[in-house]
Amino acid sequence: MERLIALLREMGIPFAYDHFAEGESPDPPFLCYLLPDSGHFPADGRVYFKIEEVRIELYTDRKDPAAESKVEAVLDQHGIFYARSEVRIESEKLYEVLYSFEMEGNNDAQEE
């Protein structure tokens, strides 16, 4: 999680986990991130290697290639392979660009 937070800070866009509190959402662009699933690798009846699914949602009020480039540059710089999709949320008058990828979880407890 610390690595993910460092990546988000490096992007230079305001972010929150899942959503901003009511009335505290910044003006676009902003990011929301989620850890909706895991694909842990088992061995000997326990979690041997933790893998987290990560979703970073970029919200903008118009198509914003500069904001997308900020996110993608950081992911690319750190060698993160991601899938990207985009949708217009008409009810919110926002664009959402979704970046999905897997990231190593906290594996500090592994025996060497």
Pin down the residues of each PLM region.
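Long, contiguous binding/interaction regions
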Residues: M1-E53, Y59-E112
